[in-house]
């Protein structure tokens, strides 16, 4: 009798994706983050579902409903903090996943990479709208500042902002629609992740060397299932430690003050995972210029495959490109730090220099260095 997992229409899909999938024998732990992102998404959808059962998307009761979840609902505090810190873990895994793709040249799988960029935008949109829902001071003012950026779009800007707000300011209509979008987007993300995997399995995984691995493949199960389980356990350990020991470490104290349109917080800033983009936005004095730089800071990822000038795919054997990659990482950490600082000297100039360096590295220095390394091969 033939094996059910190889014949049953549903099991066949699971089998070819997670069991009998031929995988390169040399992929390192940097390849774990795809599965970790899947786990993060499941955790976020489940905790979010239970939070939605008790949350009310009304300006009068939103803040107190979150308080009610934390105080009166059984393990509500745990669900709420798992959801809030789960978002941070999601972004840590996302940044490492994208970084891996950049380092090892995974962006050469064009369709997979572009769906990935789309996923990044979708996750960022979801996280932004989720941050508005508790209706604290930072929620309200963050929503006001970020949505207001759209007014920089020529001609239609002001109308567009009022259309998104559902009125003349961030109010009940805005909160209700943000809740609706925040609820539906994770399911769209899950569907996009399925398409992301579909395109990946058309080509097979890349590997650290960047060389073709067709001659040396091993089945995904048991080798990489065991490896992924280790990653999942470490993720759960980190997340639970964060939730149980210092749940507010990555949050903003201002969000424990109910939203007040008449009182502006001294420093309006987003969650830590948006600070690098926020720093780039603030480093340009012009409003439209800042908005364009903000969008391009993420959209630049879509251009990277076309700027690949090296004869080698991975950076494994390219020491100069490796140096630039780690400078880029340091630059992003600097931008993240600057995004959380007030707009004053010396932070303004540091932010501007870091923003210039960010685009310079990706668009100019890395392609030129790759060409230089190609010439080194001839020596």
From Swiss-Prot:
Pfam family, one: Cytochrome_B
Binding-site list for heme b b566: 97, 196
Listed PROSITE patterns: CYTB_CTER, CYTB_NTER
GO molecular function, one term: ubiquinol-cytochrome-c reductase activity
Example GO biological process: mitochondrial electron transport, ubiquinol to cytochrome c
Binding-site residues for heme b b562, renumbered to this chain: 83, 182
UniProt cross-references to SUPFAM superfamilies, sorted A to Z: a domain/subunit of cytochrome bc1 complex (Ubiquinol-cytochrome c reductase) (SSF81648), Transmembrane di-heme cytochromes (SSF81342)
Residues that coordinate or bind a ubiquinone: 201
Top-level taxon of the source organism: Eukaryota
Cellular component per GO, a single term: mitochondrial inner membrane
Matches recorded under CDD domains: cytochrome_b_C (cd00290), Cytochrome_b_N (cd00284)
Record's cofactor remark: Binds 2 heme b groups non-covalently.
Cofactors required: heme b
Function: Component of the ubiquinol-cytochrome c reductase complex (complex III or cytochrome b-c1 complex) that is part of the mitochondrial respiratory chain. The b-c1 complex mediates electron transfer from ubiquinol to cytochrome c. Contributes to the generation of a proton gradient across the mitochondrial membrane that is then used for ATP synthesis.
More details: Heme 1 (or BL or b562) is low-potential and absorbs at about 562 nm, and heme 2 (or BH or b566) is high-potential and absorbs at about 566 nm.
UniProt family annotation: Belongs to the cytochrome b family.
Self-association and partners: The cytochrome bc1 complex contains 11 subunits: 3 respiratory subunits (MT-CYB, CYC1 and UQCRFS1), 2 core proteins (UQCRC1 and UQCRC2) and 6 low-molecular weight proteins (UQCRH/QCR6, UQCRB/QCR7, UQCRQ/QCR8, UQCR10/QCR9, UQCR11/QCR10 and a cleavage product of UQCRFS1). This cytochrome bc1 complex then forms a dimer.
The protein's name in its UniProt record: Cytochrome b
Source species of the chain: Sorex cinereus
Gene name of the encoded protein: MT-CYB
